[in-house]
Every structure is written in structure tokens, then in C-alpha cells.
From Swiss-Prot:
Keywords: Aminopeptidase, Cell membrane, Hydrolase, Membrane, Protease, Transmembrane, Transmembrane helix. GO terms for cellular component: plasma membrane. It comes from the Bacteria. It comes from Mycobacterium leprae (strain TN). Aminopeptidase. It is a multi-pass membrane protein. GO terms for biological process: proteolysis. This is Uncharacterized aminopeptidase ML1167. It is an enzyme of class 3 (hydrolase).
């Protein structure tokens, strides 16, 4: 299987997929005061198949049962990723209102019912506990995605401290939003967008570098100085009652709901490869998978007749989704800017970018 970088290295490399952010962030937000939360919405083209895989011990989700391949509804109109813990699920009401206004959803007598699964992160300790997303956040994130698409704006997804990633933490460091994409030799493109808010670290405390050595080379990172590594090792982990990394992987391949679910399951390995530990009892790690069906592709691998004809394609797309999600995690952490005094990777390890100045907040 040959993987090639897609043009924007973004989930929006998949035609019809649109991403919008909305957040409120006070410049003086602190741990316990001010606004520091937001949402990220993924809009899909009509006829997009959806599935989900949930591995964390404390998930906060919406409409995930509906995505079980055994159930009747196949298509998804949008996916909500939100801060605010369970309160943030209120943002889905705004997403549904926006979709209804644009006549998207299951057509029923008298109107439409939009299908909007979603998941949330626990970020209530960053900023004021009572400052959390509302329905208006979801509506405005949808509008931002739509405006970027129809207005001819740059379709590249904003990363770092934006949208649902504003209050996110990755272990002891600032987390955020990341995205990545890959095009397969067989034709389909696979992309991911992730909100990194993990209990586990994305950095090896012994080296100051990512766990995945492949990513060290890809992002041209260098070993930080011993002083910077020592400073990082002294940071105490803010082990909280709830964390969670949530994301969406998408492809333009044609997949059934069951195949889509297998892709979501495979993509979870991208979290395990870049975050240690992952899928803990304190996380609610949830990954949605979307297949727009714009590209008809057949995997090159032969499979026994007794197996599903999708097996080879599922394997290829799943492996690519795993890689995309892993890369997106590191993009999120490298792009993050400090909020409420939470240190960033760039601030703690300037030596990883060839700079020898001391660490701190970015």
C-alpha cells in the first residue's frame, strides 16, 4: 500500500467535507475564570455513511447508538466535537437548527430531521466552569464552515487553540485541534480531524520527542537540550476526573456502515501510537468515521470468497485512517498556543525546532 500526502494535509481534502470552528476565549482566561471553550463541526455532503468507535471509560456522546450498523439510519449530516463536557452537547441543537434551515436531514412529512452525532471533551477546569458551549456555538460553527466553502476561502482547517480545542490539554501540555490527510495509490483520500485532550502524554518525558519515531522525522524535530527535558520532567500531571480525545476520520471511498465502523476501530490505533496511556478509564476517547462514497475503489489485496468484498479496501482505508489520526494528534500539540498558563510543546522544547532559548509558555 502506497500513501501519498494529500494537497492540503487536511480532512477537507475530501471533497464535500467542510469544517467550522467557533469559540470564546478571553485573553485573561485562567484555571477557573473566564471564557475558554468552543466547538468544531464537520459538515458532510449528502449520502455520507457514518459510524463510531468508543474506547474511553467516560464518553460523552450523542446519537452514537444510531450509528450501529444494525440500525436503520445510514447517513450522517454533521458531526459535533465540543468542549464543555456533557453541557457542550447542547451545541448540537444549533447544528440541527442550521441544517434544518438548509433542508438537510432525513426527509419526513412536514420537514427534515438532521442526523448529528457528537462527542465532547472535559475542559471545564480551564476557564469558568459555567462558561460552556450553547446551541449558538454549534450554529455559528456550521455557518463558519459553510462560509469558508462557498466564499472561496482557504479550505485548510485552522489548527491548535481553536474551536473545541481552546480548553484542551494533552497530559501536562496544551492540547488542541489537529488535522491530516493521505491519498491512497488505489484512489481514495483519507483525512482526520482531532481534538486532543488526553490524560496521557504525547511526548516521551525521557527525550522530549513524540512517541512515534516516524513523526519525529516527518515534522523535522530535533532532540531538545537536557535542560529543557529536565524542565518538562518536573511538570506535575494534572490528572483530572475526565479528559478525552475525540475525532473524525473521513474518506471519499464507498463503504458500507459496517465497513465504516471497522475504519473507526482501526483509527483508534492512531491515538494509542501517539498518546501514552490512551483509552484509559479517565478518557472518553471516541472516533467517528465518515465515507462520502464519491470514489469507487477496489483494494489490490485478494481475499477469500467467503469474506466481504470490502475487506481489502477496509484494510487500506483503516491503516491510512490510523496514520492520519496519529499525525493529526501531533499537529494539534505543535500548533497549540497557551491558554490559562498551560505550557505548550513549542514553549517547553524550543530546541526541538533548532532553538536553544529557555522553555516557557508560547
Amino acid at each position: 500500500m502506497i500513501l501519498m500526502a494529500a494537497p492540503m494535509n487536511s480532512i477537507t481534502d475530501i471533497s464535500g467535507i467542510q469544517v467550522g470552528h467557533y469559540h470564546r476565549l478571553d485573553p485573561d482566561a485562567s484555571l477557573g475564570a473566564g471564557w475558554a471553550c468552543g466547538v468544531t463541526v464537520v459538515l458532510t455532503p449528502p449520502g455520507t455513511v457514518g459510524a463510531v468507535d468508543c474506547r474511553g471509560g467516560v464518553p460523552g456522546t450523542r446519537e452514537t447508538d444510531l450509528l450501529d450498523p444494525a440500525n436503520s439510519v445510514r447517513f450522517v449530516d454533521a458531526v459535533l466535537l465540543a468542549g464543555g463536557s456533557a453541557y457542550g452537547l447542547a451545541a448540537a441543537d444549533g447544528v440541527m437548527r442550521w441544517l434544518e434551515e438548509h433542508e438537510r436531514g432525513v426527509v419526513m412529512l412536514g420537514g427534515v430531521v438532521p442526523i448529528v452525532p457528537g462527542a465532547v471533551i472535559f475542559d471545564l477546569s480551564v476557564g469558568d466552569f459555567h462558561c460552556r458551549p450553547t446551541a449558538e456555538f454549534g450554529y455559528l460553527a456550521c455557518q463558519a464552515a459553510y462560509d469558508a466553502a462557498v466564499g472561496g476561502q482557504d479550505a485548510t482547517v485552522a489548527v491548535g487553540t481553536v474551536g473545541a480545542g481552546v480548553g484542551a490539554r494533552a497530559g501536562v501540555l496544551k492540547g488542541g485541534v489537529g488535522t491530516a490527510s493521505i491519498t491512497l495509490e488505489s484512489g481514495p483520500t483519507v483525512g482526520a480531524v482531532v481534538v486532543v485532550n488526553s490524560v496521557g502524554d504525547v511526548v516521551d518525558r525521557a527525550t522530549g520527542l513524540p512517541w512515534m519515531t516516524d513523526l519525529i522525522d516527518e515534522f523535522a524535530l530535533r532532540p531538545p537540550s537536557p535542560e529543557q527535558i529536565a524542565g518538562f520532567a518536573q511538570l506535575k500531571s494534572p490528572l483530572s476526573a475526565l479528559n478525552t480525545t475525540i475525532g473524525v476520520v473521513a474518506t471519499d471511498a464507498t463503504l458500507s456502515p459496517a465497513a465504516c465502523q471497522r475504519v473507526a476501530m482501526a483509527a483508534q490505533d492512531g491515538l494509542a501510537r501517539t498518546i501514552r496511556p490512551a483509552h484509559t478509564a479517565l478518557d472518553g476517547d471516541t472516533v467517528f468515521a465518515l465515507a462520502t462514497g464519491a470514489v469507487e475503489a477496489t483494494a489490490t489485496a485478494d481475499v477469500p470468497v467467503a469474506m466481504s468484498p470490502e475487506t481489502g479496501l477496509i484494510t487500506e482505508v483503516g491503516a491510512a485512517a490510523d496514520d492520519c489520526l496519529a499525525r493529526a494528534v501531533l499537529v494539534a500539540v505543535l500548533a497549540a498556543e497557551s491558554v490559562a498558563g498551560i505550557p505548550t510543546y513549542c514553549g517547553m522544547f524550543p530546541g526541538a525546532f533548532g532553538t536553544t532559548i529557555g522553555g516557557g509558555n508560547r
